[in-house]
Swiss-Prot record:
This is Endo-1,4-beta-xylanase. Belongs to the glycosyl hydrolase 10 (cellulase F) family. One of its GO terms (molecular function) is endo-1,4-beta-xylanase activity. Residues 1-21 form the signal peptide. Its main location: secreted. InterPro entries: GH10, GH10_AS, GH10_dom, Glycoside_hydrolase_SF. It holds the Pfam family Glyco_hydro_10. It is found in: Secreted. It is an enzyme of class 3 (hydrolase). It catalyses: Endohydrolysis of (1->4)-beta-D-xylosidic linkages in xylans. It comes from Naganishia albida (Cryptococcus albidus). The active site is at 120 (proton donor), 214 (nucleophile). Its EC number is 3.2.1.8.
Amino acid sequence: MLSSTTLLAILSALALTSVQAAPADKNSLDYLANKAGKRYLGTAVQSPQLVPGSQYVQILESQFDAITPENEMKWEVVEPTEGNFDFTGTDKIVAEAKKTGSLLRGHNICWDSQLRYAHEVAPKMKLCINDYNIETVNAKSQAMAKVAAGLLAKGAPLHCIGMFKNAKRRSSGLLIRTASSGLESHFIGGSTPKDIPAAMNLFSDQGLEVPMTELDVRIPVNGNDMPANATVAKEQVDDYYTSVSACLGNDLCPGVSIWQFADPTSWIPGVFKGKLIAVSCTFSGCLLQYCVGYGAALLYDAQYQPKSTYYVVQQALKDGKNSGSKFHGIKL
């Protein structure tokens, strides 16, 4: 029989754990999300970052009430070689979620035949399809909507589509849930789709939840991982407001998960580095020309201090369903 930890490692889900938490900070992101009618405001984490008493953990526990393992529940980590399982990182993240009463989102399994097997093992689990480039109305999102409709018509246990793009922490018994599709939502500043609500409706109109599962907004940066200029910084703020507002405007969007929350822990600088694109030489020497890399995508800076992106997410949550799609400035 599979252990509960094994189930969490192989099933894509939201788990509600049994813990009574301390009184909430009424300006924290999770409190404001709950007050706005959302189930959670979450983030991705990696187990080595869970150092007791660290700035990272203090922010995690004070601002977020849902956790997604960034890598620890992926197949190649859980079962690095066939038949050999390692739940070390998974167990550490599960323990953190239990300690704080946070929701735990399993990330991820393969689909679609696994939906039925997962449902048989854990019938209370909500199961989601999580994909990228479906945050706008395009050929892929429309095709995914047809896939979802086909699965539902066949009786598949599909509950949500994730786009990878109550005012207190929970205190009830263990509840493992899904029925949705995930919108990943990895955006580039200034290029965030304006039709996210319409894309969400492709799935929510079928009764599927539409969580925003991996939100970040990368922008061009200088050598210090700071915004390259004021224009891109402003675009990034607008894009965070637009994204969070899209979730707030859809009753079947249960919440938003930021893909990590502090720039030093983001995956983006390691992938979208600046590159040498030209070399021009004269008798006096050579000029190297680099393209700008991307980074500064999250809510906290390298010193774990909140940035303008944090405050705009906070403001969008305060504005709630009346936020609209355009940010008009932070209300002090």
